[in-house]
Amino acid sequence: MGEQINLHSFRKEVDSTYVGFTPNGGSIKPVHVASGVQRCIYGGYNTTMQIKRLALVSDAKGNVPAGSELETIYSALAENETIEDGITEGAVESMRNVMQRLLSADKGVYVVKGLKDDMISFTAGSKYFLTRTSIYEDTGEFIGGLIRSYCPQLAEYIKALLDKANDPISLLFEPVLESSMQVFEKSRHEDLPAFKVPNDAVKWYLKGLNESGLCLMQNLKQHPNTLTQLRLFNFFCIFQLIRYMALLEAFYCGENIRPVLLDFSGMAPSQSSVARASEMAYTQMHKSINRFYAWGYAQKLKEKDYSKEALLESETPVYDEKKKASVELDTLWALAKERARACTTDDEVRLVFGETMYDMLALEASSHPVNCLKILGTSAGALYPPDKMHPNKRFVLSQDILEMILRSTVSPDEILSGSDMRNRLWERFGIIVGGSTYELEKLQNSGMLLQIDEDSLERNFTSF
């Protein structure tokens, strides 16, 4: 009997070999994406200790981190002559609370034992707020590396914005800003098979990334507010991350492109065929991610020379070495063995067990890949409803996301026909809104069996 399978180890290997980051969902926020993207594009990070001491008033439990007490902060400001005489401790404390909200300093992190130069993410818009790598930020580093490689003009523009540091938040913190940059040169995508030998789906995705990024850059240059520009850019990165995850099966297994059907019906799925179809498009993305990971686990089983005989004789896998296999895992593994006995090839057997390993990981760990897509999508305003009570989502865009999509599709002073608009939305984002036979065919070619007609899609496009 072979070595017992460690599910957590297999997951890390699949993410490292094929994905480029670990799409964990538990507490990921848009600010984590922003921090990773900006660090990667700028090519460095800063020591932000003084910013943290000033702005991090309390952690998620209301505790005051060591070194961040009001008396300590006030004394330091007075000693360095960075506040005027007559400003009270109460006034400083009020300003610090405003600063924490401005930065969105992550109150989900417990830092009461000491201020370390990690585990805090900022939404501010300059090089002085770039921090070293921390949890959940590898997603941003990944998409930042893609943009730097495949849309370098946009990356250079964002880097220049960060370098100027002339936004209101940077000016507010100017008395405590530090300049001690450390180099960051990681590119997470370069060693992935999908980018070493790209297939047509990868080339299509990267072409859309480049074209939409250049168009967005042209529009950002017309906008006077640096922070708004960076906010729109972060929404762009989040949407591209969602698309990337949904396309992994197409990148590695040659499957169909999964379309993003936007719902502008304004009605519930029970009342609108477009809303139902958008919900189905989201469900298809979930299933596509599931199948990709099942394939990935099967590939790893093959690398480790697991044959049909070895898998049929194997013990139930454990999530990690510290945990024993539960009754639920025993049952799932036994069912996999029953299915595998009917398979005729080792590859078929490994895929059966790969599917089961994915199900086991979903059962054992809350932070599995589809949660990452769902949480990022809802928090950024790309998916609706935003609450946890409705697991079935559909693509109903917030005004911010819609603005980003439009600014990435239509250049300044450009006028597009409806046909050109539909074509660009598909080529740049894989988006379908409706209004043509072409789009209906795209939905049908993706494998969606829908009770939806051209008239419903046309009304959806009119609402758009």
Where are the model-predicted features located?
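Long, internal scaffold/assembly segments composed of regular secondary structure
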Residues: 207-335
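Short amphipathic alpha-helical interaction segments
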Residues: 430-445
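Long, low-complexity, charged/polar intrinsically disordered regions in eukaryotic proteins
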Residues: 313-396
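Charged, amphipathic alpha-helical stretches
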Residues: 1-109
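Charged low-complexity interaction tracts in eukaryotic proteins
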Residues: 374-400, 441-464
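Short acidic, hydrophobic short linear motifs in intrinsically disordered regions
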Residues: 412-428, 432
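Long, mid-chain structured domain cores
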Residues: 80-254
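Positively charged, polyanion-binding regions of nucleic-acid-associated proteins
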Residues: 396-414
